[in-house]
Every structure is written in structure tokens, then in C-alpha cells.
Amino acid sequence: MDSVKHTTEIIVDLTKMHYHMINDRLSRYDPVVLVLAAFGGTLVYTKVVHLYRKSEDPILKRMGAYVFSLLRKLPAVRDKIEKELAAEKPKLIESIHKDDKDKQFISTLPIAPLSQDSIMELAKKYEDYNTFNIDGGRVSGAVYTDRHAEHINLLGKIYEKYAFSNPLHPDVFPGARKMEAELIRMVLNLYNGPEDSSGSVTSGGTESIIMACFSYRNRAHSLGIEHPVILACKTAHAAFDKAAHLCGMRLRHVPVDSDNRVDLKEMERLIDSNVCMLVGSAPNFPSGTIDPIPEIAKLGKKYGIPVHVDACLGGFMIPFMNDAGYLIPVFDFRNPGVTSISCDTHKYGCTPKGSSIVMYRSKELHHFQYFSVADWCGGIYATPTIAGSRAGANTAVAWATLLSFGRDEYVRRCAQIVKHTRMLAEKIEKIKWIKPYGKSDVSLVAFSGNGVNIYEVSDKMMKLGWNLNTLQNPAAIHICLTINQANEEVVNAFAVDLEKICEELAAKGEQKADSGMAAMYGMAAQVPKSVVDEVIALYIDATYSAPPSTSN
């Protein structure tokens, strides 16, 4: 007791001494100056804290962006940028409408109704704008089924019955409600969901990812975490960036290892008290590589952090790979640490666009996704997803597709796609001007250039009728194989065309690209992100624009 008392007295004496010392030094300043200094210091501190919490980007990068935002307010800089953007706008509009043959545009309601024959004729004309051979396997991803007549016929009949149904009103549309519940449960069972598991139908993979992040944001807030962080590999889908932006979260990116899988040591190092979810991809979109889900799940269990598996791309491939003869690590709810999964039915599930499933290990976690207003004057308002009204027809045709295909058909398609994916990967590895990018674990083959500009390769492949996906950081392209590419004829044709183009470019030597993807990505690498964002905005605007020369 005496030692504690003595220590306390020493602390008190030291405190008094420093108090008088500080007070004596500050006494020479005007009190108003001290108040203003304290106020200014507090303001600077709060601004710095806000800047830190706003983004996971390095401070220097954010400072550079801030400095550029100030510079572009200068008349000379602003005028230069606006002039360049103005010159770019008509080019973008022209590129969007290049396949619009007649340049006619409907901008007002017709006074009298058009006949059904006229409408169908117009729809057929618009359909003919497409110049890529989708069914012939020339398009990477996009359309994941072969669109056979029997399936299309079934979809038409189902849509006819459920075109105006809306699961928001389960009492009015009990059949649509049941279809939605059955669709969710079928997919949950594919992913070995436990008895208490639950989920929702969404409009697509992006909404499924947003919903999962929204749930974990709400869970984090309930635990007192004010500034929740998503911890995801840098190859995770950009929908996580969108979710972080919409939900007021921060996204912390984890680097990859030599195989383009998440670096587990770095992931563990980056975990702190603000991390509210860990993310693994099965597979990721850029290279088609599956992250080590069992190990990520163990990290989640170790630190008590929910783990989300993004299986949007491979959602209707990976559950069937073992049966198809391709063994992969456990990716689903059999991992105790996995708490949620996103899975697109409208990709390899072969359903029409507009359906995806977000799944949760428990109803308790699912409840964090729900939104309700119990005291609204219009009555109690409650929705499970972002949407209020939901297209029951989208759920109905997805439900019908799963039932009409059955497990055996999905296994057959999976085996065919994986077989030809690996066949193509082997052929591409033999092309000396190409370097594989990541591992082709499921249905993607990604590659970069080895002495050739890979974006020029993409441009020239497009001229031969191949529509591929361009990647960046690093520069690469990929082809996503669907059932339409899963045959030797397409695989061989792709490999032959790719090698031929690489030979031509290698013989030509390094030259500056002035058009196409090569020019666009070259520009994007050299100008500030804010300017790139403005060009992107112009491009999106162009997709809603009338053709350059129109008559109503």
C-alpha cells in the first residue's frame, strides 16, 4: 500500500510540475491566439482523420488527386481538358452507333398504337445489329447458354404466365413466392447450406455482392464498429468497390501470390479491428483463379470475422466440378468459416439475365440485409433486397431453367467446358509471344503479352470476329469459355488466330497505337483517374444517346 501511495504522489507531483511549466510558457501568448490555434489544430486533425477513413488508397496518391483537382480549376487547365473531352464525345457516340444501319430513333410515343407485326419487325431489325457470332463461340462470356429452341420455348411459356407477377405481394402472387423460395433452396443445397441457411434472389451478381456487404456493414455497426472495412484480394470483382462506395465502407485490397491467388500472409497481416468481412473469389473474374477458400475460412474463424465467397462467375460450375472429374478445394458452407456466398444463376446456370442468389449460413446474418420502416404512413414497408417490386417473371424463368436442366445436364456442361478450357490454356502456353496470367481453374483463360502489345492483340482479334475481355494492372486479356466455345473447332480456331496475330505484331515491332483498346488503355495509364472517370461518363452517356444523324 505504501508503494502505491508513493507512486501516486510522484505522478501527482509530475503532473502539477508539467501543468505549471506549460501554463507558464503559454502565458506569453494572447488567449485569442491560443483559442484559434486549438480550433485550427482540431480542424486539421479531423480533416486528416476523415481523409484517412475515407479511403484505403495511399495518402500520397490521395494528395496527388487533391492537388490535381485544384490545378484543373485553373482556366488554362480546365479549358484544355474540356476541349479534349469535347473532341472525344462525337467519337464515342459514333462508336456506340456504328452498327445502327438506318440511324432512326424513336424519341416520342406514337400517337396511334403500332401493330404487333410492326413492333416485331422493328425488334428483328434491332436484333440484326449484332455482328458477333455468339452461338459460334466468338464472344467471351456474355451469353452462357446455347439458346436451344426447346429451352427458349419453355421460357416463353413461363414468361407468359408470370410476366406481371411480383413477389413483393406474396398474398397476390403465392405461386411466384413459392418459386422464389424453391429457387433459393435449390441453390443453397448445391452449396451445402445448413438447415438454418437462408438467401435472397437478386437482379445479378453486383446486387448480390452489395447485399452481402450491406449485411456485414450493418452487423459491424451493431458491434460498435464505426468504420467497417472490406478485406478482399485485388482481383476481387469491382462490385466490392461499388458496394463499399454505396455502403460507406472502406475496401482494403490484398496482393496476390505468383499464381494470382490471394496472399494469405498479407491478408492476415492486414486484419484489424475495423475489418468486418473477408472475401475470397471462386473463381476471380480477371484470371479465373480460385482463391484458397478453406484457408480464408480458417482466418475468419480465428479472428471471428465473416467470410464471403464470391462465386458469381463460377456459381453453376464449381458445385459440379467434382462430379465432372475435376477435384477442387472445398469452396462452400462445408467450410465452417464461410458465412455467405454469391452465385449467379444467369451465367452458367443458363437462366435469362436478371437473376442471382445471395446466401447466408444463418437467418440471423440474413436479417442484417433486410430493410423495414414500421411506422410509415403508407403502412409497414419491408424488403429483403435493394428492390421494392421484383420481377416475378425473372425468378419464374430461372426456376424453370433449373428444373428443365437438372443436375446431370449441369455436370455434363461443366465437364465439357472445363475440358476445353484446359485444352485452350495448353495451346496458348505454347505461343512464345504469350504469357499465361493466373491459373485456368474453371472456365477462363487469361494471358498477357511477351514482346507484343496485348491490347493490339485484342484489337486485331476483334477484327477477326473475336470479342474478348481486356484487363489492366497488369495488361492482359481473357476469354471466358461457355458451352458455345466448348468444342475443339472453336478452341483450335482461337489458338490459330491468336498465334497468327502475335506473329504479325512481333514482325512489325513495337509501334505506338493510335486507336482501339491499345490507345484507350495507354491513355488511361497516363492521365489522372478523375479525367478517365469523365471519359467513362461520356461513354455511358453515349449508350443512351440518339444516333448522330436521326429522324423520328
UniProtKB/Swiss-Prot annotation:
Transmembrane segments: 32-52
Topological relation to the membrane, as annotated: Single-pass type III membrane protein
GO molecular function: pyridoxal phosphate binding; sphinganine-1-phosphate aldolase activity
N6-(pyridoxal phosphate)lysine modified-residue sites: 347
CDD domains: DOPA_deC_like
Lineage: superkingdom: Eukaryota
Function description: Cleaves phosphorylated sphingoid bases (PSBs or S1Ps) at the C2-3 carbon bond to yield a fatty aldehyde and phosphoethanolamine. These bioactive sphingolipid metabolites are essential for normal development, intestinal integrity, growth and reproduction.
Segments on the Lumenal side according to the record's topology features: 1-31
Name of the protein: Sphingosine-1-phosphate lyase
Disruption phenotype: Without spl-1 expression, animals become bloated, pale, congested with eggs and hatched larvae, and demonstrate shrunken gut and gonadal structures.
A GO term from the CC aspect: endoplasmic reticulum membrane
InterPro entries (UniProt xref): GrpII_AminoAcid_Decarb (IPR050477), PyrdxlP-dep_de-COase (IPR002129), PyrdxlP-dep_Trfase (IPR015424), PyrdxlP-dep_Trfase_major (IPR015421), PyrdxlP-dep_Trfase_small (IPR015422)
Pfam family, one: Pyridoxal_deC
SUPFAM superfamilies named in the record: PLP-dependent transferases
Localization terms from the record: Endoplasmic reticulum membrane
Pathway entry: Lipid metabolism; sphingolipid metabolism
Record key words, sorted: Endoplasmic reticulum, Lipid metabolism, Lyase, Membrane, Pyridoxal phosphate, Signal-anchor, Sphingolipid metabolism, Transmembrane, Transmembrane helix
UniProt catalytic activity: sphinganine 1-phosphate = hexadecanal + phosphoethanolamine; 15-methylhexadecasphing-4-enine 1-phosphate = (2E)-13-methyltetradecenal + phosphoethanolamine; 15-methylhexadecasphinganine 1-phosphate = 13-methyltetradecanal + phosphoethanolamine
Assigned protein family: Belongs to the group II decarboxylase family. Sphingosine-1-phosphate lyase subfamily.
Tissue: High expression found in the intestinal cells and faint expression in the head.
Residue ranges that the UniProt entry lists as topological domain Cytoplasmic: 53-552
Organism in which the protein naturally occurs: Caenorhabditis elegans
Cofactor dependency: pyridoxal 5'-phosphate
